[in-house]
Amino acid sequence: MTSLPCPLPGRDASKAVFPDLAPVPSVAAAYPLGLSPTTAASPNLSYSRPYGHLLSYPYTEPANPGDSYLSCQQPAALSQPLCGPAEHPQELEADSEKPRLSPEPSERRPQAPAKKLRKPRTIYSSLQLQHLNQRFQHTQYLALPERAQLAAQLGLTQTQVKIWFQNKRSKYKKLLKQNSGGQEGDFPGRTFSVSPCSPPLPSLWDLPKAGTLPTSGYGNSFGAWYQHHSSDVLASPQMM
């Protein structure tokens, strides 16, 4: 026997088998596209058509309910308070430990220059001045051993003795310069010649002895010699 293939039932066959199962029309199909039943039944249909036309496009709900408000939210950096509590106290401590910047040089006030402190002047006694003058008549410069010996004798330091000799030498040179300048100013263009009959001029080192010196101060030690020397020099031109 040969078997023939059975044809599959088509649409007509399904209608014939289930004649009572007809497709039920949907509620949305009975009304215009995009209109709800309440909108379609309202008498002011002309006013609702524009809004109904807008609803013709499919509306898709967002995946998350809060996504529709993301565009209106502020950034996270601006939403945080500016003066809120510090989250990292170690960073604040490190900033506080940084040294503060000094003001610019233009903002600094000019400071007055510091005055140099002058050392107090040494006051010499009359006995010390007498010994110092005697030694100066003998020599104007002292070696280190001589200076140390003289300082120990007089109860002074070597620096005090050194400074006294320096001041004495400068005063002595100033006196000689004034004396030579005064002679040239009184007799310009003339030179003094000493005749054989004139008394010899005292030398610069022919000073009076220390016993005849006054004890009031070393400044008067050259007073007598200066007067005697100037009188002899002035008297020599008259004897020519």
From Swiss-Prot:
Feature: DNA-binding region: 117-176
DNA-binding found in the keyword field: yes
Basic and acidic residues bias locations? 88-110
GO BP terms in the entry: cell differentiation; embryonic skeletal system development; negative regulation of transcription by RNA polymerase II; regulation of DNA-templated transcription; regulation of transcription by RNA polymerase II
Supply the InterPro entries for this chain: Distal-less_Homeobox_TF (IPR050460), HD (IPR001356), HD_metazoa (IPR020479), Homeobox_CS (IPR017970), Homeodomain-like_sf (IPR009057), HTH_motif (IPR000047)
Do you know which SUPFAM superfamilies this protein is assigned to? Homeodomain-like
Give positions of region: Disordered. 80-120
Q: In which tissues is it expressed?
A: Expressed in leukemia cells and placenta. Also expressed in kidney and fetal liver.
Q: Where in the cell is it found?
A: Nucleus
Q: Sorted alphabetically, which keywords does the UniProt record give?
A: Developmental protein, DNA-binding, Homeobox, Nucleus
**Family per record:** Belongs to the distal-less homeobox family.
Designated name of the protein: Homeobox protein DLX-4
| Natural source organism | Homo sapiens
